[in-house]
Amino acid sequence: LAVKVEQQQLSSSSLQRLLSAIRQFMKWAQDGQYLEFNPSDDFQLKRQPRPLPGMVDIETIQQILDQPKPEKESDQELWLRDKAILELLYSSGLRLAEVQSLKIKDIDFNRLLLRITGKGNKTRVVPFGSKARDALMDWLKLYPLWHGDFVPDAHVFISLKGNPLGARQIENRVKFQAQRAGVSVDLHPHLLRHCF
């Protein structure tokens, strides 16, 4: 088996899958009393280090955030919302799902704090910057035109129809605004999180 693995030059993840299959087979053989012990129990592969996530330099982020607003009024409205998303991702390090699920009641503008329910349904308090506050306030001035009145339980980031933005929509808007700014980086929310 070792010779076959070496000949095929399998990747680390392929080797892990192969070892997992062997372990399962050996466990089945042991449970069926075909083997007295599982010879694969003590065998472990060396873990390969994961590559670090990409980074974006500050000048590139500033180029995106400081780009002029579009000329069309409907595009200007989208830009206000998108800029609030970008500023929030950049200044707080939130995950995409956390931005997506953010509600109006979760924002404390006076203390520049967000109440975030993250992975494992755990709640934490996250600070955000004054530029993100200003962008959020600019967006929320426009918000009633899209959603109607302010409801504390309403999502902060919504579509023109007043529905909460989905993860894919947020990803697409982040990419779109990077392209509009003339940035060649494949920008996505998780990359902004790592710039925090």
Report the location of each language-model feature.
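Conserved catalytic core of the tyrosine transesterase superfamily
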Residues: 1-196
